[in-house]
Amino acid sequence: MSGGDGRGHNTGAHSTSGNINGGPTGLGVGGGASDGSGWSSENNPWGGGSGSGIHWGGGSGHGNGGGNGNSGGGSGTGGNLSAVAAPVAFGFPALSTPGAGGLAVSISAGALSAAIADIMAALKGPFKFGLWGVALYGVLPSQIAKDDPNMMSKIVTSLPADDITESPVSSLPLDKATVNVNVRVVDDVKDERQNISVVSGVPMSVPVVDAKPTERPGVFTASIPGAPVLNISVNNSTPEVQTLSPGVTNNTDKDVRPAGFTQGGNTRDAVIRFPKDSGHNAVYVSVSDVLSPDQVKQRQDEENRRQQEWDATHPVEAAERNYERARAELNQANEDVARNQERQAKAVQVYNSRKSELDAANKTLADAIAEIKQFNRFAHDPMAGGHRMWQMAGLKAQRAQTDVNNKQAAFDAAAKEKSDADAALSAAQERRKQKENKEKDAKDKLDKESKRNKPGKATGKGKPVGDKWLDDAGKDSGAPIPDRIADKLRDKEFKNFDDFRKKFWEEVSKDPDLSKQFKGSNKTNIQKGKAPFARKKDQVGGRERFELHHDKPISQDGGVYDMNNIRVTTPKRHIDIHRGK
């Protein structure tokens, strides 16, 4: 894995405020859709703006940026509801197609479903590495998309505002522009599919907008920055049936995982505050664009690119993040096994009980049949005293047979449940075994990557270099460590790899033949133990300086301080190496 170059431009892995390589906070996933990442419609190669390409990332501040307490939509008079209002229950995404007057939604402000409440509780953390989330729903654009992207349905999700804000919305000043929230509902991409996810883990804020009454009783308008005008009606009851819209599917795998670098890129959200005399509590509303398959692929490519770049310069943090995720998955697998063990134990108990009941019923039937045989000689002699006994025995047998049939059906159902429970437990145990192996591999990799943060002694001889030493930094595996620098550093102890990096550039600055290859600020940089700047064409985003790369990854037992294993690369070449180019 990469040794990176310094830490000054790569810090923030454990911070919720520092930017990384021009990316979002922490892991590149903090701060929401508009996190100062520098990725916006202006520098997005696929265009931007609502309904015209992809516009993930970018903007300023958290959430949607902007917005103010008086930014409720429209003139407060029309309330055009020519489109059928999409019913929106708390926590359930609904499709709404823009009409001439914007999006029409009818929010059912009843109780939040237990499933959504449990997920929000699970996301209270604490979490490392910035923003984490749970993908609740998947989006199937082929069932939603329209020919005109401006008329494509939006996915609208709502939550009770007071459930996600740090302070009651009713207590906010009327001119309050934003409010801090604990969770947001955003879109993200994974495995080339767009998802609607709940995210949490870093400080976030969203605009507060005021809903304005219209001429239609009970209908309000509100404008979320960057989204179509909302025409909202609210009722305080929960729909009897909470079903997903066509094209939106429930994700059965609800693992808590790091949110993506482009999470929230096609989502605009806000807290909507209603007039006091309306009797309605404030609601949080999230509006996400439905991406076409091509747009999803483009965004997934961008997500993968940014993930690779981050991993290349943060190998220890990446390994720790993967270990934390593997451990969380193992914990969930253990819980799954425990649930299935409980189910299987109950199934066995019921199975044994039903079997005992069936055995008893069969014995009763057998006794009745034996009694029939005992009086069978009187069957054809109605005048005989035993004939009545024969009839009674037959009636007993008939009733016993009915009971056996019922007990057999109950036993069969119990046997099926036991079989299903056995299979479910076996599958859960197999999944746990896979998660155990994954957790072990992640722990091993973390232990190896963490070696760069531990003391070590420099080894290796390096290689002879000429007066154009760093010309090779942008080629193949990079430029070698000069042999005369290796002679200076060999057998010396270093606190960590950052310490080695600093001493390496200091020694380069002391070498007359090598130092004369640097001019101006770069000469000053290496004298201070800082990496020199690469040429503009070899820089990528916030990565501007030459970097040290381990030819054999540390995760594969490559020597951390083995100077035969260390190369000097440009940022651009370093990224390409880790992409396998």
UniProtKB/Swiss-Prot annotation:
SMART domains: HNHc. Residues 242-251, 518-527 have a biased composition (Polar residues). Pfam families: Cloacin, Col-Pyo_DNase, E2R135. Zn(2+) binds at residues 549, 574, 578. Residues 20-35, 46-74 have a biased composition (Gly residues). One of its GO terms (molecular function) is metal ion binding. Residues 296-320, 429-452, 464-475, 535-554 have a biased composition (Basic and acidic residues). InterPro entries: Cloacin_colicin, Colicin/pyocin_DNase_dom_sf, Colicin_R_dom, His-Me_finger_sf, HNH_nuc, Pyosin/cloacin_T_dom, Pyosin/cloacin_T_dom_sf. Residues 36-45 have a biased composition (Low complexity). It is an enzyme of class 3 (hydrolase). GO terms for biological process: defense response to bacterium; killing of cells of another organism. One of its GO terms (cellular component) is extrachromosomal circular DNA. Keywords: Antibiotic, Antimicrobial, Bacteriocin, Endonuclease, Hydrolase, Metal-binding, Nuclease, Plasmid, Zinc. Residues 1-74, 242-269, 293-320, 421-488, 513-566 are annotated as: Disordered. Its EC number is 3.1.-.-. This plasmid-coded bactericidal protein is an endonuclease active on both single- and double-stranded DNA but with undefined specificity. Colicins are polypeptide toxins produced by and active against E.coli and closely related bacteria. Belongs to the colicin/pyosin nuclease family. This is Colicin-E2. The gene is col.
